Amino acid sequence: MALAVLHVLEPFPTETPPLAVLLPPGGPWPVTGVGLVLALRPASESPAGPALLVAAVEGSGAQCEQRGPGPPPLLVSRTLLRVLALSPGARVRARPVRRPPALGWALLGTSPGPGLGPRVGPLLVRRGETLPVPGSRVLETRPALQGLLGPGTRLAVTELQGRTKLDPESRDHNHPPPPPVVSSFAVSHSIRQLRGVLGGTGDALGVSRSCLRSLGLFQGEWVWVARVGELPNTSQPHLAQVQVLEPRWDLSARLGPNSGQPGEPLADGLVFVPATLAFNLGCDPLEVGELRIQRYLEDSTAAEDKGSCSLLPGPPFARELHIEVLPSPHCGVNGKYDHVLYQHFHTPRVVQEGDVLCVSTAGQVEILEGSLERLPRWREVFFKVKKTVGEAPDGPASAFLADTTHTSLYLAGTTLSRVPPLPSGRSPPWDSLSPPGLEALVNELCAVLKPHLQPGGTLLTGTSCVLLQGPPGSGKTTAVTAACSRLGLHLLKVPCSSLCADSSRTVETKLQTTFSRARRCRPVVLLLTALDLLGRDRDGLGEDARVVATLRHLLLDEDPLSRCPPLMVVATTSRVQDLPTDVRTAFPHELEVPVLSESQRLSVLQALTAHLPLGQEVNLSQLARRCAGFVVGDLYALLTHASRAACTRIKAAGLAMSEEDEGELCAAGFPLLAEDFGQALDQLQTAHSQAVGAPKIPSVSWHDVGGLQDVKKEILETIQLPLEHPELLSLGLRRSGLLLHGPPGTGKTLLAKAVATECSLTFLSVKGPELINMYVGQSEENVREVFARARAAAPCIIFFDELDSLAPSRGRSGDSGGVMDRVVSQLLAELDGLHSTQDVFVIGATNRPDLLDPALLRPGRFDKLVFVGASEDRASQLRVLSAITRKFKLEASVSLMNVLDCCPPQLTGADLYSLCSDAMMTALKRRVRDLEEGLEPRSSALLLTMEDLLQAAARLQPSVSEQELLRYKRIQRKFAAC
């Protein structure tokens, strides 16, 4: 993509769409007879993501002066600048689109009134944009977010509810709003209070245009800003400029879920404060608080400007500026900072004694050469102002401007200090000071670390070591990063896998080097990830005593100098039980990552999809409900899999696209649909089940279960109701155990599988004998492991088949050692602990409930007994037979009721399944015989005839005799009377 410069053309031609560009004659992109489409994106953005497709035309007013060599100009309206979130003169990357994507389907919203009228040629449209027809808007497009609306586009029209908000394109942009006017008699000594919020870019305060008028200030005017309620000696005022922040129409928001609507305007009493300025003011990053704004009144010392009738007062320039380097984990004290500082102060900067300066190193190769990181990146370097020399103005504090022309810069050694929170370059959810879903964990971390940063923190006797445990991908590192940003701490992240070595001596040396590196950049948090990898011998079976002793000594270092400023250690692990005892006891604080609730999962999904184009049918609330048991990393993987599914869907749509067409479609962007999320969710749930050892079961729905309506109702009341309406069970009165009993072959296992499928639950099937082990204590461990896997895969159903073989009555078994009694006791203990786990359910199945230990049937355990009997009447048998033959191809003459009339009166579901299997085998034999004789073509379908079913019915023998059925009914009456 070639570089181009945007020039605002005012007034913009009314006959040209506001989101079009005008090309000066003789430019690099000649316009053909059908016009030209350009793909635009800001030059600062990465080439990933959609670009803005705009029409480029040549007009009579497209004249622009070309000042020497450089990027070609593009004449645009102010509307297009707002869409791209750029200012006049900004650079963009532009390339011609040879074949813009043709839209196959579009949903249009219209207001009550005249129709759309006839189509006139292909029209370049975008999702969320108003059409030339009054009162109409593009609500949804397929397959791309923007493209050509032509004769081949299928249209769906709906009526817009309520008053439609107009796009900025529908307004009159030929007459821009007048600039703010401030009277000459404005009260210059007025002091105002505004509520500060962390945000904005650069070094200036951001306010709304109306707020600037109410303050009586000019754009770019200098003001004193200070915290309200501070004592005079605790916080000095700081100097800053005031800039107007307009609502931004960025491209991601335009093509996203809220397409076509501008950003919320800044409130009048609100001011955006950059992170560095808020830190120097001593503000809390989460709650900047009330700020006092006062106009800077000192007479300007700048040279007289002959072209202006008035000058805004500004601070003087400093003659000398003495700064100190703040060592950080990624930049040492011996770095080459001359060129970096020269580039930074090429623009005049405000400096005050005691301030921390944040200097960007982007594009400076020498910084990468001196970086301490294995994979260096361009980060920020911090300096602290030690002294300023100049003619101090009479004001609340001594503030100067420093630049390369008026100021001599002196680098005066190093010092230790906290630093302001700055973005790390990752996506917004991970850069947040309160990551969605992890707010409570970050608050706990800050509460543990903050006392060591107080003036009396050196008097604390305990060490500042925190052990953070949670499953992989649960957000442990993200939470630690957010806590460090809140507290202004450096973060040194060290994977423990990089500390492992062949010999204990090498591991010991690496540990000591890591802690020494951390001490040089205090106050710092040393983050040791996967701590369970340390302290084990080479075989991984025993402990390495030398490494454990060294690590414990470093963690419990009582040197007072190492705690001022402090060195704090946070270690993460997903297997806390694998930590050596001496290492674990060195951490006085242990925190656990909590399980995400449904509301927290929704907030994570909303943050991850904030800048993604979603289909109108995507329901994030329903998606969050289906993602129960997912951690933050799983939700991020869900978005990744959904994006891949969307790419696969477009490629499989039957569109014969070349590589160039695929590139144009990616530039136009395409939405993520509900089917993409559904496919991604199925993939993740399958992988999740395999990770926890859950078997992959076939998809069984209620349609596959014939009859048993009363049994279905009992199961749904026990399991589905707590999942769909948890607020109804807020008192904690819930059942988590369900026992299905009855004759064999009546569908008990099929019912459990159908519940797991219909309720979107993980299914853990456990056969009773497979938990029994010959070693002492191993059988109980197997029971504990089953419930631990279920809690990790929640919401989950544990299905114990043949429960009578696993939990017989205690005291009656003749096994040596009493293993069955201990297994029953362990099972009872695990069932009692399910009340603290909301989304784990236990279903047991047995033919002989009278053989079970009576303690299992007490309230709070398997307290809900459901009898699953054989089908005795023809109506219920017909429902079962219809469910089994639902996927069969039956001949038109087949009557299932006539087949049942030829069967024994009492049949179980297994008997009817055997009937269908026998009939299908007869049909297969007939089909093979007909194919060999050439009576049927090979392409014909296999049909099940009435004769096949009648032959199978004649050979059918019930699997359960009448005497056995009577015995099962007596057992049912016995337990029903209890």
UniProtKB/Swiss-Prot annotation:
Annotated residues that bind ATP are located at 470-477, 742-749
Q: What class of enzyme is it?
A: hydrolase
The catalytic activity, as recorded, is:
ATP + H2O = ADP + phosphate + H(+)
Q: Which GO terms describe its molecular function?
A: ATP binding; ATP hydrolysis activity; protein transporter activity; protein-containing complex binding; ubiquitin-modified protein reader activity
Q: Which residues carry this modification: Omega-N-methylarginine?
A: 119
Q: Which SUPFAM superfamilies match?
A: P-loop containing nucleoside triphosphate hydrolases
UniProt xrefs under PANTHER family = AAA-FAMILY ATPASE, PEROXISOMAL ATPASE PEX6
| Function according to Swiss-Prot or TrEMBL | Component of the PEX1-PEX6 AAA ATPase complex, a protein dislocase complex that mediates the ATP-dependent extraction of the PEX5 receptor from peroxisomal membranes, an essential step for PEX5 recycling. Specifically recognizes PEX5 monoubiquitinated at 'Cys-11', and pulls it out of the peroxisome lumen through the PEX2-PEX10-PEX12 retrotranslocation channel. Extraction by the PEX1-PEX6 AAA ATPase complex is accompanied by unfolding of the TPR repeats and release of bound cargo from PEX5.
Q: How does it assemble?
A: Interacts with PEX1; forming the PEX1-PEX6 AAA ATPase complex, which is composed of a heterohexamer formed by a trimer of PEX1-PEX6 dimers. Interacts with PEX26; interaction is direct and promotes recruitment to peroxisomal membranes. Interacts with ZFAND6.
Spell out the protein name for this chain: Peroxisomal ATPase PEX6
Give the originating organism.
Answer: Rattus norvegicus (Rat)
GN (gene name): Pex6
